[in-house]
Curated annotation (Swiss-Prot):
Biased composition (Polar residues): 15-25
Its biological purpose: In concert with FKH1, plays a role in directionality of mating type switching by controlling which donor mating-type locus is inserted into MAT locus during mating type switching.
Region Disordered, annotated ranges: 1-36, 57-76, 299-322
Biological processes per GO annotation: donor selection
Basic and acidic residues bias (residue ranges): 308-319
Name listed for the protein in its UniProt record: Protein FDO1
Gene behind this protein: FDO1
Note: Present with 2120 molecules/cell in log phase SD medium.
Phenotypic consequence of gene deletion: Leads to a defect in donor preference during mating-type switching. Does not affect FKH1's overlapping role with FKH2 of regulation of the expression of the CLB2 cluster of genes during the G2/M phase of the mitotic cell cycle.
Gene Ontology cellular component terms for the protein in this record: nucleus
Assembly with partners or alone: Interacts with FKH1.
Length: 342
């Protein structure tokens, strides 16, 4: 509209777009407002058509125009043969009626029409403003909802990405742990196989050593049996300590008689030297060791010269007790004198 003004009164202003939001109280009256807007729009369209066609007419003019049009139709029906003449007459009548309406129209009718049109347009403008405010509210709500939806969607995407990353990280960690456990298991299995082989080898060696020991034990027992059978002692009754003392005295007496006999033989033969075997058999010892076995039943003594032994021993018939005698050296000089025993 250029000025939206009809008769010099205040102009009709349409609603302008504003960034302010209205209250949501009008949401419940959307249906009523929509029906009112449609009615007002229809009325406004009718008024605009009238203004574009013939201009605005009063109700009286509309009543005059309607019977004239009906009379014209009736005259056309009656006089079919004189259509051309009647048309000319009707055009002349229309021109006359228009002139009469223009001359006899009162200013009150025009003011009423203007007021009616202004009211209709004003109501139309108000309804349009309400519709614009509702549209703004709905757009703002739509914008908020879309932003919330985008935020929720972006948050879900971020959470999904984080969960995927966590899953991949845990999967990689589990794979590494599984591989390390497999390596440890393989190493331990290899160690077990190696130790099994070593244990088998050691068992074989132990079995071989046990066989060798058994063979040597059999040979040693056979040697011991042969040696014990060769050195069997004559059986005798067990002796008391007093008998052992008497036996020791007897042996000492026997030794003394032997010494005296040796001295007498030296005097008669002018030189008799008794030397006992020493040094050739043992490297450290120059004396002979006498082992005298005593048997009270036999009543005699048996002397054995053993160069390998160092101590003089007296054994009974059963070999249970052994009497150790001191080492004795006996020798005589050329002139027959006896030296002390050292």
């Amino acid at each position: 509209m250029e000025e939206n003004k009809l008769s010099g009164n205040k102009p009709i202003q349409l609603a302008t777009w504003s960034n302010q939001m209205g209250s949501p109280e009008n949401n419940g009256n959307n249906a009523n407002n929509g029906s009112d807007v449609q009615n007002v729009i229809q009325k406004a369209l009718g008024l605009i058509r009238q203004l574009n066609n013939n201009g605005l007419m009063s109700p009286m003019e509309e009543e005059h125009s309607q019977p004239s049009s009906s009379q014209e139709t009736l005259s056309v029906d009656r006089e079919i043969n004189e259509q051309g003449r009647l048309r000319l007459l009707m055009q002349a009548k229309d021109d006359n009626t228009r002139k009469e309406v223009g001359t006899y129209s009162s200013p009150m009718d025009s003011a009423y029409a203007r007021e009616n049109m202004l009211n209709v347009l004003q109501s139309l403008v108000t309804h349009l403003n309400q519709a614009v405010s509702q549209i703004q509210q709905l757009k703002f709500k739509n914008m908020i909802l879309t932003s919330n939806e985008n935020n929720i969607q972006s948050r879900h995407e971020v959470e999904d990405n984080l969960q995927k990353q966590q899953f991949e990280r845990m999967k990689c960690q589990f794979l590494l742990e599984r591989q390390s456990l497999k390596d440890q298991l393989r190493k331990r299995e290899n160690k077990i196989v190696k130790y099994k082989q070593k244990i088998i080898e050691k068992n074989k060696k132990l079995n071989n050593l046990a066989k060798v020991l058994n063979q040597h034990a059999i040979s040693d027992t056979s040697q011991i049996d042969s040696f014990s059978s060769s050195v069997k002692k004559t059986p005798s009754s067990t002796t008391t300590p007093q008998e052992m003392k008497s036996d020791m005295l007897n042996t000492l007496g026997i030794l003394a008689t032997h010494v005296l006999k040796d001295e007498i033989d030296d005097d008669s033969g002018n030189q008799t030297i008794l030397q006992l075997a020493a040094g050739s058999i043992s490297n450290d010892c120059n004396t002979t060791e006498l082992e005298i076995t005593c048997s009270p039943e036999m009543g005699r003594t048996i002397t054995h010269n053993r160069p390998n032994t160092k101590d003089e021993s007296i054994q009974d018939s059963h070999g249970n007790r052994t009497l150790q005698l001191p080492k004795m050296k006996s020798f005589s000089t050329i002139d027959g004198s006896i030296k002390d025993i050292k």
